Amino acid sequence: MTEIRDDSISIALDAMGGDSAPDVVIEGANLVLSGVVPCDGKVHFSIYGKKEEVLPVLAKYKLVEANSVFVDVSDAVSSSDRPSYALRHRRRSSMWHAVEDLKKGLVSAVVSAGNTGALMAISRHLLGTIHSIDRPAIAVAMPSQKSSFVVLDIGANIECSADALLQFAIMGVAFAKAILGRTDPKVGLLNVGSEEVKGTYAVQEAFSLMRAAKSKMDFYGYIEAEEVFKGEVDVVVADGFSGNIMLKTTEAVANLLMSLFKGVVKSSITAKIAACMLKPSVRKTMELVDPKLYNGAMLVGLNGVVVKSHGSADGKAYACAIKTAVHSARYAIVSKIASEISEMG
């Protein structure tokens, strides 16, 4: 394999993680390198996996082979592994070695479509957390009628204290500034209603804490799931249980609508002609709601860039996760989040 230039971003890929690994992982890398899913600047990869499974796939993608180094490992994290088991027994896995090399500074970011709980546990164990952060969260950007917003947590912390939700809000503000380019992000707390008496005890307590911190953040108040896509807020804070359900329901509805639309287009010659006439506008609208293009959630609060791809991602979706990792690493998202957290106290 060719020598890698020093001015490029190095991304570690867990080739054993995901429903269709390693094929989707290598395909995603190829889409990035070929410019189908463009990234900022030059990119090269460190690919971690079992050689008997990865090398035959890698041989089919000469562009990836020429712009990567392969690291042979003897183990892989299973989708059924509990986080504690992965910490004790998966230290020879592709996921562990990828995160460990990030800790050593050998790569700039890690992308994995593997077991979420194991990825969070291994990353937290090896990288540690940003100062003053107790519980890292998983954050992802989503589209709205006005622009886009970030939602966290989407699955790392099923149950959260009020203090944890406040920390999520602070990290969300930092993420929105660094990734979305917002100057004064508005924060909404996901709830079942807008009245102060609604919600769990932790959510009500978090509401009080965020309102008290209004001098440090623009707190919108409670926001219901039906309102988040109107673009009224830049950051949606939720516990991992609620956030994950909101995310996956949204993705399912988006996929349903896209499927229904395609069915209508194929239903008649008139519909096909109309679709052809409106093709540019239709494509643009479809891209705005395509879950694949928003694949790639960042584990925020860690001392390193770790991006989680959907386990069911296809090549294009995985490439978008790589794009998120490249952008986050190139623009020093971790140091920017740490700086924002320090300023907000």
Swiss-Prot record:
Tagged with keyword Protein transport: no
Pfam family, one: FA_synthesis
InterPro entries found in the cross-reference section: FA_synthesis, Phospholipid_synth_PlsX-like
Keyword Lipid biosynthesis recorded: yes
Catalytic activity: a fatty acyl-[ACP] + phosphate = an acyl phosphate + holo-[ACP]
Chief subcellular location: cytoplasm
E.C. designation(s): 2.3.1.274
Localization per record: Cytoplasm
Organism superkingdom: Bacteria
Gene Ontology CC: one annotated term: cytoplasm
Key words of the record: Cytoplasm, Lipid biosynthesis, Lipid metabolism, Phospholipid biosynthesis, Phospholipid metabolism, Transferase
GO biological process: fatty acid biosynthetic process; phospholipid biosynthetic process
MF terms (GO), sorted A to Z: phosphate:acyl-[acyl carrier protein] acyltransferase activity
Biological role: Catalyzes the reversible formation of acyl-phosphate (acyl-PO(4)) from acyl-[acyl-carrier-protein] (acyl-ACP). This enzyme utilizes acyl-ACP as fatty acyl donor, but not acyl-CoA.
Protein family: Belongs to the PlsX family.
Cross-referenced NCBIfam families: plsX (TIGR00182)
Name this protein carries in UniProt: Phosphate acyltransferase
Gene source species: Anaplasma phagocytophilum (strain HZ)
